[in-house]
Amino acid sequence: MSDEEHHFESSDAGASKTYPQQAGTIRKNGYIVIKNRPCKVVEVSTSKTGKHGHAKCHFVAIDIFTSKKLEDIVPSSHNCDVPHVNRTDYQLIDISEDGYVSLLTDNGSTKDDLKLPNDDTLLQQIKSGFDDGKDLVVSVMSAMGEEQINALKDIGPK
């Protein structure tokens, strides 16, 4: 054994948070990065090629974490950044007083670094279901280094 100790904290193995995709191939309900925010595309319109230049794509998208509306216009032949968006389901174990949740992962360990969602209706559903003693499964969306609870699944009483 050597005296050197290596500590690797990264969990994404150096993988890129986004990948390039040609603007003309991004469709409604797809994902795109606008102003460094991961967004879901709600509307795409394409303008014809003009006298000087390319056809342009006009994207209207909603930030997947803040629900803010963002817009961007990109030449259809150019590449856009598309975020790697992952959805994972976890069983809710506990809600702490400071607003953090304790979640059970598939391999049996716990995940304790997520806060309750900002969405009031979802927040109330989670709290009331948890207070009623139901087994709750929350859906966590992650993209570009951010994570947030975005859905709730009720799997019945305990």
Swiss-Prot record:
Tissue: Expressed in leaf vasculature and inflorescence stems. Present in xylem tissue but not in phloem, and in developing vessel members, but not in mature vessels members. Detected in anthers.
Naturally occurring in which organism (per UniProt): Arabidopsis thaliana
Keyword annotations: Hypusine, Initiation factor, Phosphoprotein, Protein biosynthesis
Role this protein plays: Translation factor that promotes translation elongation and termination, particularly upon ribosome stalling at specific amino acid sequence contexts. Binds between the exit (E) and peptidyl (P) site of the ribosome and promotes rescue of stalled ribosome: specifically required for efficient translation of polyproline-containing peptides as well as other motifs that stall the ribosome. Acts as a ribosome quality control (RQC) cofactor by joining the RQC complex to facilitate peptidyl transfer during CAT tailing step. Involved in xylogenesis.
UniProt modification remark: Lys-51 undergoes hypusination, a unique post-translational modification that consists in the addition of a butylamino group from spermidine to lysine side chain, leading to the formation of the unusual amino acid hypusine. eIF-5As are the only known proteins to undergo this modification, which is essential for their function.
Single GO biological process annotation from the record: positive regulation of translational termination
Biased composition range(s): Basic and acidic residues: 1-10
Alphabetical list of NCBIfam families matching this protein: eIF_5A (TIGR00037)
UniProt xrefs under InterPro entries: IF5A-like, IF5A-like_N, NA-bd_OB-fold, Rib_uL2_dom2, Trans_elong_IF5A_hypusine_site, Transl_elong_IF5A_C, Translation_prot_SH3-like_sf
Positions carrying Hypusine: 51
Residue numbers of Phosphoserine PTMs: 2
GO CC annotations, alphabetized: extracellular region
One annotated GO molecular function: ribosome binding
Gene name as annotated: ELF5A-1
Expression induction or repression: Up-regulated at post-transcriptional level by iron deficiency.
Superkingdom in the source lineage: Eukaryota
Listed name of the protein: Eukaryotic translation initiation factor 5A-1
